[in-house]
Each structure stands twice: as C-alpha cells, then as structure tokens.
Curated annotation (Swiss-Prot):
GO terms for cellular component: cytoplasm. Binds 2 Zn(2+) ions per subunit. The active site is at D306. Catalyzes the reversible cyclization of carbamoyl aspartate to dihydroorotate. Its EC number is 3.5.2.3. Its cofactor is Zn(2+). This is Dihydroorotase.
Length: 425
C-alpha cells in the first residue's frame, strides 16, 4: 500500500529524528523521509500538520484470549482495540485454551491473524509444557513457528533449576524469556496490595516482597547464566531498584510496567471495584513514583498494557472471586502522554518506551521509520480530548478502571504496512 503522511512532527528515536517531515510509504515500506515530498498521482495522503508521527506503537504484553476463550476477546476484536489505541503490533501471551506450547497452536494464531487482524500479531509461546512449570516446552519449535518470546505469564516458573535451564536454552536459540515474577507462597490467597487499604477493607493482601523476591531470583539466574531475561509488569519500589542495580553491574535484564501502575494506587479498590483488581495488584503512591522514576531514568524499558479482557460475569461478582485483569489497549497512550505533560518524560523517551524498545526486546523488524522499514506508523493528536465510554471501546470486554475518565491525547491514524487501519472519528 502507498501513503503520504505530510507535515507532521516525526519522532523516531531509532534514527535520532525529531523534525517536521513528510513520510512516504510505497508498497508497504518506508520509501523516503523529507520535506515537501512528492508522491505518485493517486497516492492517498494524510495531513499531519500539528500532529505527531511515530514508528508504529508496539504492545509487547496482551491477552487476546484466542484460542478457547473467545467469549472474552478474539484476534479480530483485540486487534481492533489495538488499532484504536494506536498500536500497529501486539505480542499475545500464551495462557489461552489450549496454551501456546506447540507449533500447531502458534501457527493457528499466526494464520488467523493474517486473515482477521487489523494489526501485526506476534505470539508468545510457553516456557514450560502446558504452562505447568514441570518441563520445558519445545522452544526451538515455537521460535520456528513464529513465536517472538516465551513466558508462562499468569504465573511464575517456580522451579529455579527449570528457570535456569530455560534461560540457558533460550539464550542458545535467541528467543526472549519473559518472567511473570511473584512468589506464590507469599501471594497466598491475597487479592490486593497488602497495606492500610487492604486492612481497612478486610481483604487479604499481597505483600510487595512477593514481587521483589521473585524479580531478584530472575536477575541472579540471568546473571549466573549470562543470559537475558525480561521482567513483565513490575509494580514496586523494590523491583525497580533491583533491576536498576542489576543493569549497573551488566546483567542482561529488561523490564516493563503498565499504565495502571503509574496512574492508580490501591485506593482505587475502595468500593470493592473489581475493575481495579489485577495481578500484580495496584500498589502505593511510593510505588507509582518509583515507576515514573524508572521510566525516566531508563531502568524500565517498555510500557506494556497487560490487556486482560474478561466477561462481565467474571467481574460482576464478589471481589475475592473476581478474575484479575483490565483492558488497556485504548487507554495506554493518553495515560502515558500524561507523563509527558507532567514533565516526567519527553516525547522521544515515550516513543522509545512504546515502540523502539519493545521491538528490540522481542527482536522485531519494527519500531523504526528507516528507509526500507515496514510502513507501520502511528499518528497522534496529543491535544485531542475524549472520554472513556464502555460502549465506544473496541474490545469485546469493557473491564476498565478508567471508564468515565476524561483523557487527553489519542491516535488519530494507525497505519499498518502503508494501510490506514484506524482513523479517529
């Protein structure tokens, strides 16, 4: 597909570009960047004057629920939600039914995405067979099938020797290991952050130590094995400190956090709102500050949504039995832009966190507008104001703690391989 994007502020940290430029895409790839570009007659054009033009945003942690849990979300609806949020690529986690632990399931997702998805869908395979934490999955086969990482997300690999072997094997074949880091014994029957609010509400708490101890284990295993590891959805002061210190001594560790962890505290649980129930849980104001500081100083490498759709029947129940997770694809960008408005990040940092870095971590040929690169582009209006309404969310599920919130900033065009797959109304 051919497309000319004219006059926008192009921000591409992969090339050190921050300038008003045109972007010309031909046959689905970036052909030229420059001022006053001419396109062949009949080429569609976007007037991006006053808008921000970036490499397509990448969410490296989503749950598309397909196969087996399509009543919550499927590849078609999840990709529509991604496109509406400005994401041109998503990596989908393997805790489906059946789980993504075989070439057949990975191939199913890739083939279905080719026919139904508006955006690029990259599967993440399981670390262990069946996601049971007992023996390693066939990582080589998963990589051959198109998986860009492995994870038992939803729960940790509890056996340290097994995790060590996973890191060593993954290093050998060049695939990213993504750790869901928590100590399940400490989590116990906890349903929210352990602290004043949990005590006041009479709910069992999950201590910050459950995350910190598990993150520390992964760091030491990666250091011992000389292998890279990526830590999913960090949320605590301690886990940020552990990763920061590990990076300083050369450990190959990367990590992500999610917008809810730098926006909401456990105060959001008051009223027993199950849309504020997630794993890891919402933490304290000090933890929010740690996430913002970690994003600013490079400790945290990526912003990922952990988009986790659930049917109303799984959320409209008592807090203790409600399932964990929220939808986040359509609210991630404005919540992240707020960090720019607050002066905690600049736009170049934000684009790195939401596009360039996720591409590097997963080894994707995305996250750049270099000539010859895939023509995936996000066009953003940072001043556009809108309200989060359940009826207007593209996701099949509506379990968001941000319903009713007034947002500022959103993607107005999402372009995949030169084709506009989303345009804001």
């Amino acid at each position: 597909m051919n497309l000319l994007i004219k006059g926008g502020r192009v921000i591409d940290p992969s090339q050190g570009i921050d300038a008003n430029l045109d972007v010309l895409i031909a046959d689905g790839v970036v052909l030229e960047l420059g001022q006053g570009l001419a396109a062949p007659e009949g080429t569609p054009a976007i007037d991006a004057g006053g808008l921000i033009v970036t490499p397509g945003l990448i969410d490296m942690h989503v749950h598309l629920r397909d196969p087996g849990l399509e009543y919550k979300e499927d590849i078609a609806t999840g990709s529509r939600s991604a496109a509406a949020g400005g994401f041109t690529s998503v990596a989908c986690m393997p805790n489906t039914s059946p789980v993504i632990d075989s070439k057949a399931i990975a191939s199913y997702i890739i083939n279905k995405a080719k026919s139904e998805a508006l955006v690029n869908v990259f599967p993440i395979g399981c670390i262990t067979k069946g996601g049971k934490g007992e023996s390693l999955a066939e990582m080589g086969e998963l990589k051959e099938a198109g998986c860009v990482g492995v994870s038992d997300d939803g729960k940790p690999v509890c056996n340290s020797e097994l995790m060590r072997r996973a890191l060593e094997y993954a290093k050998g074949i060049g695939i990213t290991v993504i750790s869901h880091s928590e100590d399940l014994a400490l989590v116990g029957e906890g349903v929210m952050n352990e602290g004043f609010v949990s005590t006041e509400l009479g709910l069992k708490g999950i201590p910050w130590a459950a995350e910190d101890i598990a993150v520390a284990r992964e760091v030491y295993l990666a250091e011992f094995a000389g292998a890279p590891v990526h830590i999913a959805h960090i949320s605590t002061v301690g886990s940020a400190r552990i990763v920061r210190n590990a990076k300083a001594r050369g450990v190959k560790v990367t990590c992500e956090t999610a917008p809810h962890y730098f926006t909401l505290t456990d105060e959001a649980v008051r009223g027993y709102d199950t849309n504020a129930k997630m794993n890891p849980p919402l933490r304290s104001a000090a933890d929010i500050e740690a996430m913002k500081a970690g994003l600013a100083d490079g400790t945290i490498d990526a912003i990922a949504t952990d988009h986790a759709p659930h049917h109303p029947d799984e959320k409209d129940v008592e807090f203790n039995v409600a399932l964990n997770g929220i939808v986040g694809l359509e609210t991630s960008l404005p919540l992240s832009l707020k960090l720019v408005e607050e002066g905690r990040l600049d736009l170049n940092q934000l684009v790195s966190l939401m596009s360039c870095n996720p591409a590097k971590i997963l080894g994707l040929d995305r996250g750049t507008l270099k000539v010859g690169a895939v023509g995936d582009v996000t066009v953003i209006d940072p001043a556009k104001e809108w309200q989060v309404e359940a009826a207007k969310l593209e996701s099949k599920s509506k379990n968001s703690p941000f319903l009713g919130w007034k947002m500022k900033g959103r993607a107005v065009y999402t372009v995949v391989k030169g084709q506009v797959v989303y345009q804001a109304g």
